[in-house]
Amino acid sequence: MSSTAGGEVSINSGDLLLGTLSTSITKLEQQIRATQLSQKKLNSDCETMAEYLRDLSEYKQPVDLLPYVGKLNDSTIRVNNTHQKLDDLLERLTKLQRQIARETYKKKNSIKEQEPPVQPEN
């Protein structure tokens, strides 16, 4: 950027481009550093979880899974109830479609059976 004697400020397009790129590059570097830090934390958490699982597998007493089995059974019951409701709904829709098809068939037949109006002769 340079200034002239008349108090005007002229902007060199190259300086403007470099300034914009440098800002973008700085933001990108910050995002990369933040990603690297989060990856390190994730790695640390994975190691902690693996250690916990190793400790858990060394226990002589089995893990109590009864609460989880109960929750799974409750979920299964809910899924089955939903499935039954959907089946009932599908059955009602099928009946409705059949009734509509019957009514449509009857209407078409009644229209076909009607005599066409006599057209005047020329």
Curated annotation (Swiss-Prot):
Keyword check for Coiled coil, yes or no: yes
Write out the GO cellular component annotations: BLOC complex; BLOC-1 complex; secretory granule; synaptic vesicle
Which residues, by range, are in coiled-coil regions?
76-109
Name the Gene Ontology biological process terms.
endosomal transport; endosome to lysosome transport; intracellular protein transport; lysosome localization; lysosome organization; positive regulation of gut granule assembly; positive regulation of intracellular protein transport; synaptic vesicle exocytosis
Molecular-function annotations in GO: SNARE binding
| Record keyword Coiled coil present | yes
Q: Which InterPro entries match?
A: Snapin (IPR017246), Snapin/Pallidin/Snn1 (IPR028119)
Its keywords, alphabetically, are: Coiled coil
Q: Its function? A: Component of the biogenesis of lysosome-related organelles complex-1 (BLOC-1) involved in gut granule biogenesis.
Assembly information from the UniProt record:
Component of the biogenesis of lysosome-related organelles complex-1 (BLOC-1) composed at least of blos-1, blos-2, blos-4, dsbn-1, glo-2, mutd-1 and snpn-1. Interacts with dsbn-1.
What family is it from? Answer: Belongs to the SNAPIN family.
Q: What's the protein here called?
A: SNAPIN protein homolog
> What organism is recorded for this protein?
Caenorhabditis elegans
